[in-house]
Regions:
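Short, Lys/Arg-enriched N-terminal segments with co-localized hydrophobic residues
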Residues: 28-40
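Glycine-rich phosphate/pyrophosphate-binding loop and the adjoining helix
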Residues: 41-48, 178-225
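N-terminal beta1-alpha1 ligand-phosphate binding loop
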Residues: 42-74
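Short hydrophobic segments within beta-strands
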Residues: 50-51, 80, 152
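A generic structural motif
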Residues: 72-78, 177
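N-terminal beta-loop-helix "entrance" segment that forms/cooperates
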Residues: 82-98
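Helix-loop-strand module that forms the ligand-binding subsite of alpha/beta enzymes
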Residues: 95-176
Length: 225
């Protein structure tokens, strides 16, 4: 039987060479599967996260950093800082500033979105609403369209930012985004669960963040089918 060749990142290999192992990103992985199964190996899902706060000691930035530590192995999380995005001006929606162009490009390139939001005046903070307005405009050029999304929130109060989350969900209807519904991550009394260095120290909170990420990954895979 003539050996079959298979083109990989490591070069042109025969099926005999591929049978015991395949090189992926510098790591050698062993498989007891056929060549076609190797060819269909799932790529790592990408998640873009951002927090609706500019504050240096933000609790929501802290839960986002915790998410980066807890993301499942089959996914990666990149955090985008909203610092520097100017107030939305519809006069410039077709020629936005460079930071907005980068933000929209990151959104389009990612598989899923993770938002961490404070609650201001029973609703979404201006920083987050402003970023969403830029990224979804002009009409017909909505970077968020079709994206799976998960929400986290943290506050020093009892409700943990619940009202901001529900207002965000209203926006998702128009933005044509697909939110994860469970579990809900609403970190109440955040000062007791996040230390002075900005690390989430409450194990139950870390567990729920991990579960939310697992749900987001599963939901993203399902939507891709």
């Amino acid at each position: 039987m003539t050996p079959t060749s298979f083109n990989t990142d490591a070069g042109l290999l025969t099926n005999e060479q591929l049978l015991p192992k395949v090189i992926v990103g510098g790591d050698v992985l062993s498989f007891n599967v056929g060549i076609m199964e190797r060819a269909n190996m799932e790529k790592q899902l990408s998640i873009l996260g951002f927090a609706g706060s500019l504050r240096k000691g933000s609790y929501n930035k802290a839960v986002l950093r915790a998410a980066a530590e807890l993301v499942p192995n089959e996914a990666s999380l990149e955090i985008f800082d909203l610092e520097g995005i100017p107030p939305f001006n519809q006069d410039f929606e077709k020629t936005p500033p460079d930071i907005v162009k980068r933000f929209k490009s990151k959104i389009r390139a990612t598989d899923a979105i993770l938002i961490a939001t404070p609650e201001h005046n029973y609703s979404v903070p201006g920083v987050l609403k402003n970023a969403i307005d830029w990224a979804s405009r002009p009409y017909g050029d909505n970077s968020f369209e079709g994206k799976p999304v998960a929400i986290m929130s943290a506050s020093t109060g009892m409700l943990g930012g619940a009202r901001a989350q529900y207002h965000l969900r209203q926006m998702f209807v128009f933005l044509d985004m697909h939110p994860v519904n469970h579990p809900e991550v609403m970190v109440n009394f955040a000062a007791q669960k996040i230390d002075e260095q900005g690390k989430v120290i409450d194990e139950e909170t870390r567990k729920r963040i991990r579960q939310l990420l697992e749900s987001l990954v599963a939901w993203t895979k399902k939507l891709k089918q």
